[in-house]
């Protein structure tokens, strides 16, 4: 399945989620700016708040760009669940300085993206359903980071929603969430942009303006 753009994909998901979650004690948590574009029509249709969580991926050096983990906006680092403990130990031993430098740079990028807009307290998520929205999940790295970020928060129900996901990511969603909504599972997942005709993602500033226009502060405080 292919989509004209992320807004169209979000509208399709919104119709699926409207009856169980419309106008309920539910919030949308979008992963990155791509997730924001998918989440916006869902929030408008369901008339529920939309927030965005910032994450930055950490890759190993070299041409193969092995993804080792993800930093969230609290500065917490989560190793990819795809890695074995032996791989983690090897990477830490060989690439410790690189990983630490990338963590620092990731936090600088997240702080620049946040700007002076401030945070929304995690209390905004307490005892709510959370619809976790991505524009596409090739791996579970971002999922693991966001779930670690949400671990202290008492929630009612976790729903994973995305237009596209690999089989591995879907398997991880089954473990991490109470309900999943994936429009198009992919056995051979290409890059996320491949599945959209239009790939005009907003800049960080445009993303902030988009969230503020919806009447919600953009970030959840870590």
What do the predicted segments below correspond to?
Residues 1-222:
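PRPP-associated nucleotide enzymes
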């Amino acid at each position: 399945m292919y989509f004209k753009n992320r807004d169209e994909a979000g509208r399709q998901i919104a119709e699926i989620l409207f009856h169980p979650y419309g106008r309920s004690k539910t919030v949308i948590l979008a992963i990155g700016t791509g997730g924001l574009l998918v989440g916006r029509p869902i929030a408008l249709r369901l008339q529920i708040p939309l927030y965005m969580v910032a994450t930055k991926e950490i890759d190993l050096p070299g041409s193969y760009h092995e993804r080792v983990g993800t930093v969230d906006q609290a500065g917490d680092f989560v190793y990819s669940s795809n890695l074995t403990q032996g791989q983690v130990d090897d990477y830490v031993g060989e690439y410790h300085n690189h990983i630490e430098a990338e963590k620092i740079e990731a936090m600088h990028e997240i702080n620049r993206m946040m700007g002076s807009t401030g945070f929304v307290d995690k209390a905004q998520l307490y005892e709510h359903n959370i619809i976790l929205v991505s524009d596409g999940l090739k791996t579970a790295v971002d999922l693991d980071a966001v779930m670690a970020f949400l671990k202290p928060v008492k929630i009612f129900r976790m729903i994973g929603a995305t237009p596209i996901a690999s089989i591995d990511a879907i398997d991880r969603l089954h473990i991490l969430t109470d309900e999943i909504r994936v429009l198009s599972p992919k056995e051979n997942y290409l890059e996320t942009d491949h599945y959209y005709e239009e790939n005009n993602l907003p800049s960080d500033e445009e993303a902030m303006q988009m969230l503020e226009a919806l009447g919600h502060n953009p970030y959840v405080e870590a």
